[in-house]
From Swiss-Prot:
Record-annotated Glutaredoxin domain positions: 241-351
Native organism taxonomy: Eukaryota, Viridiplantae, Streptophyta, Embryophyta, Tracheophyta
CDD domains: GRX_GRX_like
Stretches assigned to coiled coil: none
Positions of region (Disordered): 386-405
Name of one Pfam family that matches: GRXCR1-2_C
GO (cellular component) term, any one: plasma membrane
Comp. bias (Acidic residues): 386-401
Native species: Arabidopsis thaliana
Name of this chain's protein: Uncharacterized protein At3g28850
InterPro entries in alphabetical order: Glutaredoxin, Thioredoxin-like_sf
Length: 428
């Protein structure tokens, strides 16, 4: 034992290589697969503890995974013997201890629990809560607005100013305090109101007007004298009506308007007034300011400065002789109230099938102007010099100079600045 030959050799006798250090071989547990058929042979499968967690199961279906997991757990726990050995010598089969069996059962249960939890997470859908944005279907709710508005007229609004001046009215009807069950139409009520106002005594109206004029200028019902000067009067008394009819006689209605379409509002108002006046069947003297500058001077003279105010004359304007009636707004209002026909009832009327009664003039085509026959619309006339040989008498020097000045081109005395004259057929 103590001799040199008994020492361990460091090299192999055959290959002369050094021995490798002893390696700890990791032992693994073997699982015994029982034979299913008589022809099958028994074999052992070695599994290490580190490979238990890396087993890949089939994901085909839930029942299929459960079946494979149960088979694997049974095979893992059912083994009763373990094959041991160092790899160089013969393997020795020994029986498993109770501790090893309990560890294998615990590992199988843990693996089954992990697989079950993963499969349940995959099966449960992830539902994201959403707020409903669509109104659920149902019948619309009916709201009675009369019930909501009931009693609102009697309630004083907090937004209303306490200094608000209340309105007043006059009860002129004989049965004004009585209320009938049936409500009259609006147009009947307006006619009754107009008849009631006509029954007022003129002295009462004048005294009431004076009292309103004496109020301070800041008062909402104050009336100034300037308002009565600008507004034409149409409500005449019986005496004034007789005087007016005698003075008017058969005077014509004169309309100052424009046919230019540069300002659309002015042109449309001029057309409206022309249609209203022609519908009454009276003779209208239409004077187009854009065709003749003399009409513009006449209008300025008739209106005066109080209507102009330095701003400019607006068109159209209607006159009865030299009496001003009004513009477009006044004519519309009088026509709607039925007072325009009464006011112009004494004017000269147009006979049927005559120019001005819906028929156009054959000479001017309702333009009321034709080209000048003297200058043919050029506004210029040329006078030639005439030399008389038989005339031996010589006139004075002044007369000769005057005659020389009249020769050549001269301004046409018959037409206006546009070379036009008024139509001799419809503007007689």
């Amino acid at each position: 034992m103590g001799c040199a030959s008994s020492k361990h050799r460091k090299r192999c006798l055959h290959c002369r290589r050094g021995y490798s250090p002893p390696v700890d071989v990791q032992r693994s547990h073997s699982v015994h697969h029982a034979s299913q058929n008589s022809e099958d042979s028994c074999h052992m499968v070695a599994l290490s503890s580190s490979s238990l967690g890396s087993l890949k199961l089939c994901d085909s279906s839930f029942g299929h995974n459960h079946k494979h997991l149960a088979d694997f757990s049974e095979k893992l726990v059912s083994g009763e013997s373990v094959k041991t050995g160092n790899g160089f010598g013969p393997n020795v089969v020994r029986e498993k201890s109770d501790k090893e069996k309990s560890n294998l059962e615990l590992q199988a249960k843990l693996m089954e629990a992990k697989v079950w939890s993963s499969m349940m997470n995959e099966k449960i859908p992830k539902i994201v809560p959403k707020t409903p944005i669509v109104t659920p279907p149902g019948e619309p709710e009916t709201i009675n607005t009369w019930e909501m508005m009931d009693g609102l007229e009697d309630v004083l609004s907090p937004l209303r100013s306490p200094n608000h001046v209340k309105s007043f009215s006059f009860d002129v009807g004989p049965n004004g305090g009585k209320s009938n069950g049936s409500v009259k139409p609006v147009w009947l009520q307006m006619e009754e109101e107009e008849e009631g106002f006509e029954d007022f005594d003129p002295e009462i109206i004048s005294s009431f007007r004076k009292s309103l004029q004496e109020l301070p200028s800041d008062h909402p019902f104050h009336i100034s004298n300037h308002d009565f000067e600008l507004k034409p009067r149409f409500n005449f008394s019986d005496e004034e009506k007789e005087e007016e009819e005698q003075s008017v006689g058969k005077e014509r209605v004169i309309l100052y308007f424009t046919s230019l379409r540069g300002i659309r509002k002015t042109y449309e108002e001029s057309c409206d007034v022309r249609v209203i006046l022609k519908s009454l069947g009276i003779r209208v003297d239409e004077r187009d300011v854009s065709m003749h500058s003399g009409f513009k001077d006449e209008l300025k003279e008739l209106l005066g400065e109080k209507f102009n105010k330095g701003v400019g004359i607006t068109l159209p304007r209607v006159f009865l002789g030299r009496k001003y009636i009004g513009g477009a707004e006044e004519i519309r209002k009088l026509n709607e109230d039925g007072k325009l026909e009464k006011l112009l009832g004494g004017c000269e009327r147009v006979e049927e099938n005559q120019n001005g009664n819906g028929l156009e003039c054959e000479a001017c085509g309702d333009v009321r102007f034709v080209p000048c026959e003297t200058c043919s619309g050029s506004c210029k006339v040329y006078y030639e010099y005439e030399d008389d040989d038989d005339d031996d008498d010589e006139g004075d020097d002044d007369e000769s100079v005057k005659e020389e000045r009249e020769y050549g081109f001269q301004t046409c005395p018959d037409c206006n600045e546009n070379g036009l004259i008024r139509c001799p057929v419809c503007c007689d």
